[in-house]
Protein backbone atom coordinates (compact mmCIF):
# COMPACT_ATOMS: atom_id res chain seq x y z
CA UNK A 1 0.00 0.00 0.00
CA UNK A 2 1.36 3.42 -1.00
CA UNK A 3 2.25 5.70 1.90
CA UNK A 4 0.67 9.14 1.72
CA UNK A 5 1.17 12.43 3.55
CA UNK A 6 -0.92 12.52 6.73
CA UNK A 7 0.54 15.56 8.49
CA UNK A 8 2.78 18.57 7.89
CA UNK A 9 3.97 20.71 10.77
CA UNK A 10 6.34 23.68 10.91
CA UNK A 11 7.76 25.69 13.78
CA UNK A 12 10.37 28.37 14.43
CA UNK A 13 13.94 27.42 15.29
CA UNK A 14 17.12 29.52 15.39
CA UNK A 15 19.79 29.62 12.72
CA UNK A 16 23.52 30.13 13.25
CA UNK A 17 23.11 33.94 13.45
CA UNK A 18 20.42 33.75 16.18
CA UNK A 19 17.70 34.60 13.66
CA UNK A 20 14.52 32.54 13.36
CA UNK A 21 14.03 30.08 10.53
CA UNK A 22 11.67 27.17 9.86
CA UNK A 23 11.92 23.51 10.63
CA UNK A 24 9.32 21.35 8.89
CA UNK A 25 8.22 17.78 9.63
CA UNK A 26 6.24 15.73 7.10
CA UNK A 27 4.62 12.53 8.42
CA UNK A 28 3.36 9.66 6.26
CA UNK A 29 0.61 7.09 6.72
CA UNK A 30 3.36 4.49 7.23
CA UNK A 31 4.59 6.53 10.25
CA UNK A 32 7.79 7.34 8.37
CA UNK A 33 8.62 11.03 8.51
CA UNK A 34 11.12 13.57 7.24
CA UNK A 35 12.46 16.80 8.75
CA UNK A 36 14.27 19.73 7.16
CA UNK A 37 15.44 23.18 8.27
CA UNK A 38 15.78 26.18 5.98
CA UNK A 39 18.93 28.35 5.66
CA UNK A 40 19.14 32.13 5.12
CA UNK A 41 21.60 34.37 3.28
CA UNK A 42 23.30 37.66 4.22
CA UNK A 43 24.41 38.90 0.80
CA UNK A 44 21.43 38.00 -1.38
CA UNK A 45 20.78 38.31 -5.09
CA UNK A 46 18.02 40.72 -6.13
CA UNK A 47 16.22 37.99 -8.08
CA UNK A 48 16.20 35.37 -5.32
CA UNK A 49 12.91 33.82 -4.26
CA UNK A 50 11.39 35.75 -1.36
CA UNK A 51 12.15 34.75 2.22
CA UNK A 52 9.03 35.63 4.19
CA UNK A 53 9.67 37.52 7.45
CA UNK A 54 7.06 38.85 9.87
CA UNK A 55 8.46 42.42 10.11
CA UNK A 56 7.08 42.57 13.67
CA UNK A 57 9.69 44.67 15.45
CA UNK A 58 8.43 43.39 18.82
CA UNK A 59 9.79 39.89 17.98
CA UNK A 60 13.34 39.08 16.88
CA UNK A 61 13.82 42.57 15.46
CA UNK A 62 11.22 41.89 12.79
CA UNK A 63 12.85 38.68 11.59
CA UNK A 64 10.32 36.21 12.96
CA UNK A 65 8.85 33.62 10.58
CA UNK A 66 5.49 32.93 12.23
CA UNK A 67 3.62 33.85 9.04
CA UNK A 68 5.68 31.35 7.05
CA UNK A 69 5.00 28.74 9.77
CA UNK A 70 1.29 29.51 9.52
CA UNK A 71 1.43 29.12 5.74
CA UNK A 72 2.92 25.64 6.13
CA UNK A 73 0.53 24.54 8.86
CA UNK A 74 -2.50 25.96 7.03
CA UNK A 75 -2.83 26.24 3.23
CA UNK A 76 0.22 24.15 2.27
CA UNK A 77 -0.75 21.33 4.63
CA UNK A 78 -4.33 21.37 3.36
CA UNK A 79 -3.17 21.20 -0.26
CA UNK A 80 -0.76 18.29 0.26
CA UNK A 81 -2.58 15.91 2.62
CA UNK A 82 -3.07 12.57 0.88
CA UNK A 83 -0.30 13.15 -1.68
CA UNK A 84 2.25 10.47 -2.54
CA UNK A 85 5.60 11.78 -1.19
CA UNK A 86 7.42 10.17 -4.12
CA UNK A 87 5.68 12.64 -6.46
CA UNK A 88 8.18 15.41 -5.73
CA UNK A 89 7.60 17.35 -8.94
CA UNK A 90 3.83 17.28 -8.48
CA UNK A 91 4.08 18.35 -4.83
CA UNK A 92 6.40 21.24 -5.69
CA UNK A 93 4.11 22.24 -8.58
CA UNK A 94 1.09 22.33 -6.24
CA UNK A 95 2.94 24.65 -3.83
CA UNK A 96 4.18 26.92 -6.63
CA UNK A 97 0.64 27.24 -8.04
CA UNK A 98 -0.81 27.78 -4.56
CA UNK A 99 1.65 30.64 -4.06
CA UNK A 100 0.81 32.16 -7.44
CA UNK A 101 3.83 34.48 -7.80
CA UNK A 102 7.06 34.20 -9.77
CA UNK A 103 9.22 34.61 -6.68
CA UNK A 104 7.17 32.75 -4.05
CA UNK A 105 6.33 36.02 -2.29
CA UNK A 106 2.91 34.97 -0.98
CA UNK A 107 3.69 31.78 0.90
CA UNK A 108 7.44 32.43 1.21
CA UNK A 109 10.27 30.46 -0.35
CA UNK A 110 11.34 29.51 3.17
CA UNK A 111 7.94 27.90 3.82
CA UNK A 112 7.82 26.12 0.45
CA UNK A 113 11.43 24.89 0.61
CA UNK A 114 11.04 23.50 4.10
CA UNK A 115 8.12 21.38 2.95
CA UNK A 116 9.79 20.40 -0.33
CA UNK A 117 12.85 19.04 1.46
CA UNK A 118 10.94 17.40 4.30
CA UNK A 119 8.80 15.55 1.72
CA UNK A 120 11.97 14.19 0.07
CA UNK A 121 13.32 13.03 3.43
CA UNK A 122 10.00 11.38 4.29
CA UNK A 123 9.96 9.51 0.97
CA UNK A 124 13.60 8.46 1.41
CA UNK A 125 13.01 7.26 4.96
CA UNK A 126 9.90 5.37 3.87
CA UNK A 127 12.02 3.58 1.24
CA UNK A 128 14.72 2.96 3.87
CA UNK A 129 17.25 4.89 1.79
CA UNK A 130 19.62 7.74 2.66
CA UNK A 131 18.67 10.93 0.86
CA UNK A 132 21.62 10.78 -1.55
CA UNK A 133 20.58 7.32 -2.79
CA UNK A 134 16.91 8.28 -2.98
CA UNK A 135 17.72 11.33 -5.14
CA UNK A 136 20.70 9.93 -7.03
CA UNK A 137 19.51 6.40 -7.72
CA UNK A 138 21.04 3.25 -6.30
CA UNK A 139 23.81 3.09 -8.88
CA UNK A 140 24.77 6.76 -9.02
CA UNK A 141 27.10 7.84 -10.52
CA UNK A 142 28.40 9.26 -7.27
CA UNK A 143 31.53 11.19 -6.41
CA UNK A 144 32.76 12.91 -3.27
CA UNK A 145 32.83 16.68 -3.76
CA UNK A 146 35.87 18.92 -3.50
CA UNK A 147 35.24 21.31 -0.59
CA UNK A 148 35.75 25.06 -0.91
CA UNK A 149 36.74 26.03 2.61
CA UNK A 150 36.21 29.63 3.62
CA UNK A 151 39.05 30.36 6.05
CA UNK A 152 39.17 34.18 5.88
CA UNK A 153 35.85 36.07 5.95
CA UNK A 154 35.22 39.65 4.89
CA UNK A 155 32.49 41.76 3.31
CA UNK A 156 28.96 41.12 4.58
CA UNK A 157 30.12 38.04 6.52
CA UNK A 158 32.40 39.87 8.95
CA UNK A 159 32.98 43.23 10.63
CA UNK A 160 36.55 43.68 9.42
CA UNK A 161 38.02 45.89 6.69
CA UNK A 162 38.18 43.34 3.84
CA UNK A 163 36.02 44.11 0.82
CA UNK A 164 35.82 40.60 -0.57
CA UNK A 165 33.57 38.18 1.24
CA UNK A 166 35.39 34.85 1.18
CA UNK A 167 38.98 33.71 0.79
CA UNK A 168 38.94 29.95 0.43
CA UNK A 169 41.25 26.97 0.19
CA UNK A 170 40.46 24.10 -2.19
CA UNK A 171 42.28 20.81 -1.40
CA UNK A 172 42.25 19.55 -4.98
CA UNK A 173 45.28 17.27 -4.57
CA UNK A 174 43.89 15.09 -1.77
CA UNK A 175 43.24 11.41 -2.60
CA UNK A 176 39.93 11.18 -0.67
CA UNK A 177 37.35 13.50 0.85
CA UNK A 178 38.50 12.50 4.35
CA UNK A 179 42.05 13.53 3.47
CA UNK A 180 40.81 16.76 1.88
CA UNK A 181 39.10 17.58 5.17
CA UNK A 182 42.34 16.86 7.04
CA UNK A 183 44.31 19.12 4.67
CA UNK A 184 41.83 21.92 5.33
CA UNK A 185 41.78 21.47 9.10
CA UNK A 186 45.57 21.54 9.29
CA UNK A 187 45.76 24.73 7.23
CA UNK A 188 43.01 26.26 9.40
CA UNK A 189 45.08 25.64 12.54
CA UNK A 190 48.28 26.88 10.86
CA UNK A 191 46.49 30.08 9.86
CA UNK A 192 45.25 30.64 13.40
CA UNK A 193 48.81 30.30 14.71
CA UNK A 194 49.99 32.88 12.15
CA UNK A 195 47.25 35.32 13.15
CA UNK A 196 47.95 34.95 16.88
CA UNK A 197 51.71 35.32 16.39
CA UNK A 198 51.13 38.63 14.57
CA UNK A 199 48.68 39.95 17.12
CA UNK A 200 45.80 39.75 14.63
CA UNK A 201 42.25 38.88 15.60
CA UNK A 202 41.47 35.17 15.49
CA UNK A 203 37.72 35.50 16.07
CA UNK A 204 35.59 33.99 13.32
CA UNK A 205 32.88 35.33 11.00
CA UNK A 206 29.46 33.98 10.04
CA UNK A 207 30.86 30.99 8.18
CA UNK A 208 33.62 30.06 10.61
CA UNK A 209 36.52 31.72 8.83
CA UNK A 210 38.84 34.13 10.58
CA UNK A 211 38.01 37.82 10.26
CA UNK A 212 41.20 39.87 10.83
CA UNK A 213 41.77 43.45 9.75
CA UNK A 214 44.49 43.36 7.08
CA UNK A 215 46.34 46.03 5.05
CA UNK A 216 44.45 45.02 1.89
CA UNK A 217 42.60 42.12 0.29
CA UNK A 218 45.76 40.72 -1.28
CA UNK A 219 47.25 40.29 2.20
CA UNK A 220 44.62 37.61 2.83
CA UNK A 221 46.02 35.55 -0.05
CA UNK A 222 49.55 35.98 1.27
CA UNK A 223 48.55 34.86 4.77
CA UNK A 224 46.76 31.79 3.43
CA UNK A 225 49.74 30.80 1.26
CA UNK A 226 52.00 31.02 4.30
CA UNK A 227 49.57 28.84 6.29
CA UNK A 228 49.44 26.24 3.51
CA UNK A 229 53.23 26.02 3.54
CA UNK A 230 53.32 25.97 7.36
CA UNK A 231 51.06 22.90 7.20
CA UNK A 232 53.54 21.26 4.78
CA UNK A 233 51.36 21.44 1.68
CA UNK A 234 52.23 22.82 -1.75
CA UNK A 235 50.11 25.73 -3.03
CA UNK A 236 48.93 25.09 -6.58
CA UNK A 237 49.41 21.34 -6.24
CA UNK A 238 47.90 20.05 -3.01
CA UNK A 239 45.77 23.10 -2.30
CA UNK A 240 44.51 25.92 -4.53
CA UNK A 241 42.90 29.25 -3.63
CA UNK A 242 39.36 30.43 -4.38
CA UNK A 243 37.64 33.78 -3.96
CA UNK A 244 34.08 34.97 -3.49
CA UNK A 245 34.24 38.66 -4.33
CA UNK A 246 30.48 39.16 -3.74
CA UNK A 247 30.87 42.12 -6.08
CA UNK A 248 27.17 43.01 -6.11
CA UNK A 249 27.77 44.33 -2.58
CA UNK A 250 30.49 46.67 -3.93
CA UNK A 251 28.63 47.92 -7.03
CA UNK A 252 27.12 51.40 -7.01
CA UNK A 253 26.39 53.75 -9.89
CA UNK A 254 28.24 51.58 -12.38
CA UNK A 255 31.45 51.40 -10.32
CA UNK A 256 33.02 49.02 -7.81
CA UNK A 257 33.94 50.51 -4.44
CA UNK A 258 37.10 48.50 -3.82
CA UNK A 259 39.83 49.50 -1.34
CA UNK A 260 38.58 53.11 -1.39
CA UNK A 261 38.84 53.29 -5.19
CA UNK A 262 35.97 53.51 -7.66
CA UNK A 263 36.81 50.88 -10.27
CA UNK A 264 35.22 50.36 -13.67
CA UNK A 265 34.29 46.85 -14.77
CA UNK A 266 37.44 46.70 -16.89
CA UNK A 267 39.61 47.78 -13.95
CA UNK A 268 37.99 45.16 -11.73
CA UNK A 269 38.62 42.50 -14.39
CA UNK A 270 42.25 43.63 -14.63
CA UNK A 271 42.63 43.25 -10.85
CA UNK A 272 41.14 39.74 -10.88
CA UNK A 273 43.26 38.74 -13.88
CA UNK A 274 46.40 39.96 -12.14
CA UNK A 275 45.61 37.79 -9.11
CA UNK A 276 45.06 34.68 -11.24
CA UNK A 277 48.57 35.20 -12.63
CA UNK A 278 50.17 35.91 -9.27
CA UNK A 279 48.42 33.29 -7.09
CA UNK A 280 47.19 29.69 -7.58
CA UNK A 281 43.54 30.79 -7.87
CA UNK A 282 41.29 28.07 -9.28
CA UNK A 283 37.87 29.70 -8.79
CA UNK A 284 36.36 33.21 -8.63
CA UNK A 285 32.74 33.62 -7.54
CA UNK A 286 30.70 36.75 -8.28
CA UNK A 287 33.72 38.55 -9.70
CA UNK A 288 31.33 41.22 -10.96
CA UNK A 289 27.86 42.45 -9.99
CA UNK A 290 24.64 40.62 -10.83
CA UNK A 291 23.59 43.76 -12.75
CA UNK A 292 26.81 44.06 -14.76
CA UNK A 293 26.07 41.57 -17.54
CA UNK A 294 28.27 43.44 -20.03
CA UNK A 295 31.16 43.26 -17.57
CA UNK A 296 30.50 39.57 -16.94
CA UNK A 297 30.77 38.89 -20.66
CA UNK A 298 34.17 40.60 -20.75
CA UNK A 299 35.31 38.73 -17.63
CA UNK A 300 34.27 35.42 -19.17
CA UNK A 301 36.03 36.18 -22.45
CA UNK A 302 39.19 37.06 -20.52
CA UNK A 303 39.36 34.18 -18.03
CA UNK A 304 36.95 31.36 -18.97
CA UNK A 305 39.74 28.96 -19.99
CA UNK A 306 42.03 29.87 -17.09
CA UNK A 307 39.85 29.75 -13.99
CA UNK A 308 36.41 28.69 -12.80
CA UNK A 309 34.05 31.70 -12.96
CA UNK A 310 31.11 31.05 -10.66
CA UNK A 311 27.78 32.84 -10.97
CA UNK A 312 25.88 33.13 -7.70
CA UNK A 313 23.94 36.40 -7.46
CA UNK A 314 23.73 36.65 -11.25
CA UNK A 315 22.00 33.24 -11.62
CA UNK A 316 20.31 32.77 -8.19
CA UNK A 317 19.86 29.02 -8.88
CA UNK A 318 17.16 29.93 -11.40
CA UNK A 319 17.10 27.70 -14.53
CA UNK A 320 15.59 30.46 -16.69
CA UNK A 321 18.29 32.97 -15.73
CA UNK A 322 21.01 30.34 -16.09
CA UNK A 323 19.77 29.50 -19.58
CA UNK A 324 20.02 33.18 -20.51
CA UNK A 325 23.57 33.24 -19.11
CA UNK A 326 24.57 30.15 -21.07
CA UNK A 327 23.31 31.72 -24.31
CA UNK A 328 25.28 34.91 -23.60
CA UNK A 329 28.41 32.96 -22.54
CA UNK A 330 28.35 34.32 -19.00
CA UNK A 331 30.53 32.46 -16.44
CA UNK A 332 31.40 28.77 -16.66
CA UNK A 333 30.01 27.50 -13.35
CA UNK A 334 27.04 28.06 -11.05
CA UNK A 335 26.63 28.18 -7.29
CA UNK A 336 23.51 26.25 -6.28
CA UNK A 337 21.60 27.36 -3.19
CA UNK A 338 18.32 25.63 -2.44
CA UNK A 339 16.66 28.66 -0.89
CA UNK A 340 17.44 30.97 -3.81
CA UNK A 341 14.84 29.14 -5.92
CA UNK A 342 12.74 27.52 -3.18
CA UNK A 343 11.99 23.93 -4.25
CA UNK A 344 13.98 20.75 -4.67
CA UNK A 345 12.51 20.18 -8.15
CA UNK A 346 13.68 23.55 -9.48
CA UNK A 347 17.09 23.09 -7.86
CA UNK A 348 17.57 19.74 -9.59
CA UNK A 349 16.46 21.30 -12.89
CA UNK A 350 19.13 23.99 -12.53
CA UNK A 351 21.82 21.41 -11.75
CA UNK A 352 20.77 19.34 -14.77
CA UNK A 353 20.85 22.36 -17.09
CA UNK A 354 24.30 23.38 -15.86
CA UNK A 355 25.76 19.90 -16.24
CA UNK A 356 24.31 19.40 -19.72
CA UNK A 357 26.09 22.59 -20.79
CA UNK A 358 29.38 21.64 -19.11
CA UNK A 359 29.07 24.35 -16.46
CA UNK A 360 30.66 23.50 -13.14
CA UNK A 361 28.24 22.97 -10.24
CA UNK A 362 28.96 23.93 -6.63
CA UNK A 363 26.31 23.01 -4.05
CA UNK A 364 26.32 25.71 -1.39
CA UNK A 365 25.26 26.58 2.14
CA UNK A 366 24.12 30.05 3.22
CA UNK A 367 25.72 32.26 5.83
CA UNK A 368 22.74 31.66 8.14
CA UNK A 369 22.74 27.88 8.59
CA UNK A 370 21.42 25.14 10.86
CA UNK A 371 22.50 21.59 11.66
CA UNK A 372 20.55 20.41 8.58
CA UNK A 373 22.86 18.45 6.24
CA UNK A 374 20.74 18.27 3.07
CA UNK A 375 23.38 19.93 0.90
CA UNK A 376 25.89 17.17 1.68
CA UNK A 377 23.51 14.52 0.36
CA UNK A 378 22.54 16.75 -2.58
CA UNK A 379 26.17 17.24 -3.64
CA UNK A 380 26.71 13.48 -3.76
CA UNK A 381 23.30 12.64 -5.27
CA UNK A 382 23.77 15.05 -8.20
CA UNK A 383 27.45 14.21 -8.72
CA UNK A 384 28.06 17.96 -8.46
CA UNK A 385 31.73 17.39 -7.57
CA UNK A 386 32.08 20.60 -5.56
CA UNK A 387 30.60 21.82 -2.28
CA UNK A 388 30.90 25.10 -0.43
CA UNK A 389 29.94 24.89 3.21
CA UNK A 390 32.20 27.21 5.15
CA UNK A 391 35.21 26.85 7.37
CA UNK A 392 36.49 24.07 9.61
CA UNK A 393 34.76 25.29 12.76
CA UNK A 394 31.19 26.09 13.88
CA UNK A 395 28.94 23.08 14.20
CA UNK A 396 26.54 24.41 11.56
CA UNK A 397 29.39 24.10 9.00
CA UNK A 398 31.13 21.00 10.37
CA UNK A 399 27.82 19.07 10.37
CA UNK A 400 27.94 19.03 6.57
CA UNK A 401 31.57 17.87 6.50
CA UNK A 402 30.85 15.11 9.00
CA UNK A 403 27.85 13.98 6.96
CA UNK A 404 30.10 13.76 3.88
CA UNK A 405 32.58 11.64 5.86
CA UNK A 406 29.72 9.31 6.73
CA UNK A 407 28.60 9.10 3.09
CA UNK A 408 32.17 8.42 1.92
CA UNK A 409 32.42 5.51 4.37
CA UNK A 410 29.07 4.12 3.20
CA UNK A 411 29.87 4.37 -0.52
CA UNK A 412 33.56 3.55 -0.30
CA UNK A 413 34.86 2.83 -3.84
CA UNK A 414 31.49 3.78 -5.38
CA UNK A 415 32.26 7.46 -4.82
CA UNK A 416 35.82 8.50 -5.73
CA UNK A 417 37.02 11.95 -4.68
CA UNK A 418 36.50 14.34 -7.60
CA UNK A 419 39.82 16.21 -7.23
CA UNK A 420 40.87 18.23 -10.25
CA UNK A 421 38.24 16.47 -12.39
CA UNK A 422 35.68 18.68 -10.63
CA UNK A 423 36.88 21.72 -12.55
CA UNK A 424 35.55 21.95 -16.10
CA UNK A 425 36.74 25.41 -17.12
CA UNK A 426 39.47 24.12 -19.44
CA UNK A 427 37.27 21.41 -20.97
CA UNK A 428 34.17 23.31 -22.16
From Swiss-Prot:
Cofactor: binding details: Binds a second Mg(2+) ion via substrate during catalysis.
Keyword annotations of the record: Cytoplasm, Glycolysis, Lyase, Magnesium, Metal-binding, Secreted
Enzyme Commission no: 4.2.1.11
Tagged with keyword DNA-binding: no
Predominant subcellular localization, coarse grouping: cytoplasm
Record note on quaternary structure: Homodimer. Component of the RNA degradosome, a multiprotein complex involved in RNA processing and mRNA degradation.
UniProt-recorded name of the protein: Enolase
Naturally occurring in which organism (per UniProt): Coxiella burnetii (strain RSA 493 / Nine Mile phase I)
Gene (UniProt): eno
